[in-house]
Amino acid sequence: MHGVSGALGWAVSPAVLVSVTTLAGWRQALLVAALIAGAILILLFVRRHVLLGTDEQRAHEAHIKKNGSPFSLSFLKLRTVWLCWGFFFLSALALSGVQSFAPTAMQILYDLPVALTTTAYSSYMLASAGGMFLGGFIAARAKAPDRIIAIGFVTASAISVLISLTWVSGSSMMSLFTLMGFCVGISGPSRDLMIRTATPKEASGRVFGVVYSGLDSGLALGPLLFGLLMDWSLVPGVFVLIAGFLLSALLTAYRVGENNRTQQLKNTSI
């Protein structure tokens, strides 16, 4: 559900902030964004007891800390942790291209107005949310999450390259871009399941913290790379690079899946 809610937030934010900017100016739009963030912070504080868990859960965590977990930092030596980090990093690079540069690139390549390209981005994120919802049911039944990711990412990469070639009309491109979002979204739950399988139970929180830092790193670096392509007037390269990052992320997911299957075979044979 965290993935679905995040995708919905990304889908709604352009419409909300662009509308406020048009009606009242960019300063008011920033104020609205700050007020929303502040409201969420207040909600988290008021409902903090839900996040802290039950007394039994807190007692169990205190017991583990008291006795010292063998996975305090040793999880950093696990190859799968860094493969998962690489997956998040590369997929975040692709996401940064979609978020920050794909609408502008579509505007240039297909001669579309800003309103339509912004709508295309919102449709991408809404489809991504729908894909995540459906992907949750698929991941619950899948024995190999990395293969679900492969199907989604390969299809999304092919669509991204097709968009870069400008072989289709503007309306068809928007439909394809929406389908691309659905394909990426349907892989989300399988991604989380893959990481959970590769994570030591005693260090799950720390592993997810390290792995998710790859998301922030990718979102920070991506605009620099895609911005260079735009500065060099290599606009089709935006979609080609998005496809390249998705396929590179797929390779790391495949390696994680292979490691998980190997470990499961070892555990079965013991």
What does each of the following model-derived ranges do?
Residues 141-153:
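Cytoplasmic membrane-interface "Motif A"-like loop-to-helix N-cap segments
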Residues 52-83:
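Juxtamembrane intracellular "pre-TM" segments in multi-pass secondary transporters
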Residues 186-199:
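Intracellular juxtamembrane helix-capping segments at the cytosolic ends
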Residues 2-52:
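Helix-loop-helix hairpin linking two adjacent transmembrane segments in secondary transporters
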Residues 80-125, 129-132:
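Extracytoplasmic gate region of multi-pass secondary transporters
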Residues 22-34, 228-245:
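A membrane-interface helix-boundary motif in multi-pass transporters
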Residues 155-168:
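C-terminal ends and interior cores of transmembrane alpha-helices
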Residues 132-144, 230:
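Helix-to-loop junctions at the C-terminal end of transmembrane segments
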